[in-house]
Regions:
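Extreme N-terminal cap/leader segments of soluble proteins
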Residues: 1-66, 88, 97, 108, ...
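Active-site-proximal betaalpha loop/short-helix elements
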Residues: 187-256
């Protein structure tokens, strides 16, 4: 696909459009009396607590996903919350859920999926809210965690290298752009792979980071750059991907284990070795720059994909 057409396709993808839908919320929250030491726009709300931080996050599942694949929706609701906690250098403590279904029978696969993921990641589900007399089926999950040190999305620095860490040992969902490298994986390996992120945080190996979300690697890059008030040049030809997935679809995919890290050049080798030791791909895909633009380049040339002086994404970088 031509670079200009690829850029247009990505900008019109639901993953990025949904991130822009956050703008009214970011504008509203900027007028509230949030404590000055809590940055709005990270993967979790990080609240100073003693010698560390409490981490709080929540995720809602897409209604059609809940309807069409309830077991995997239940699993994913836990998995994405766990990922948010680890992405910030923390470890999960407990989960609560809000589950609405049309009857008790329809709630069972959602509960089974959540339970399976909670066992795999060893995070207890400790309560929540349930309604099995609803006119529709819906699920959201919230999580509490704790970190000694943080990996925030607010501290990328010009000159940093952008690393994409991803587990390519998976498969694409038959209907949704989800790269599943989790449900058939040994839970011990799942947890050990995620433990890399507290290690990165506690050894100051990473300036900033985010987990790759529904916006794909490009949308996630935009979110990190917006909150850090930086830009970047990303080389599309270096982005790791499975050979069986078309590149445009891959760029819009949400991996079960995918992270974007902003790392000082002197620490890149050490960070990559940590992932390599776990057989996880960790590739240098670009550089953070001091111009507020995301520039995509390939063998075809380059294009300004996003100019933050002209257009916000979530709006959080504008209010932080």
């Amino acid at each position: 696909m031509r670079l200009d057409l690829l850029a247009h396709t990505l900008k019109q993808s639901l993953g990025i459009l949904h991130k822009q839908d956050i703008q009214p919320v970011s504008s509203f929250l900027s007028t509230e009396n949030a404590p000055n030491d809590i940055l709005l726009g990270d993967d979790c709300a990080a609240m100073p607590d003693g010698d560390g931080y409490l981490l709080l996050a929540a995720e809602g599942m897409m209604p059609d996903f809940v309807e069409s694949d309830p077991w995997f929706a239940g699993w994913s609701a836990v998995m994405v919350n766990v990922s948010d906690i680890y992405a910030m250098g923390g470890r999960p403590i407990a989960i609560v859920d809000t589950l609405w279904s049309q009857d008790a029978v329809l709630s069972q696969p959602l509960l089974a999926g959540m339970s399976a993921a909670a066992r795999a990641y060893q995070v207890p589900i400790v309560g929540g809210h349930t309604n099995v007399r609803s006119r529709y089926n819906a699920l959201s999950v919230s999580i509490l965690g704790r970190a000694q040190k943080l990996i925030s999305s607010f501290h990328a620095q010009p000159g940093d290298r952008l690393l994409m860490a991803i587990d390519l040992r998976g498969k694409l969902h038959h209907k949704y752009p989800f790269w599943n490298a989790a449900t058939e994986t040994d839970p011990i390996r799942l947890r050990a792979d995620l433990e890399l992120f507290p290690t990165l945080a506690e050894h100051d190996l990473c300036n900033a980071g985010k987990d790759v979300s529904m916006g794909g690697i490009i949308g996630t890059s935009l979110m990190l750059l917006e909150t850090s008030k930086c830009g970047a040049i990303i080389d599309l030809d270096t982005i790791p991907r499975p050979p069986t997935v078309p590149f445009d679809r891959w760029l819009m995919s949400f991996p079960s284990y995918g992270f974007l890290l902003s790392v000082h050049p002197d620490r890149v080798a050490a960070v990559q070795q940590l992932f390599r030791d776990r057989q996880i791909t960790c590739t240098d895909i670009g550089e953070v720059i001091d111009i507020p633009q995301l520039i995509l380049k390939s063998q075809q040339g380059s294009t300004i994909f996003w100019d933050f002086d002209r257009e916000h994404l979530t709006g959080f970088g504008n209010t932080a």
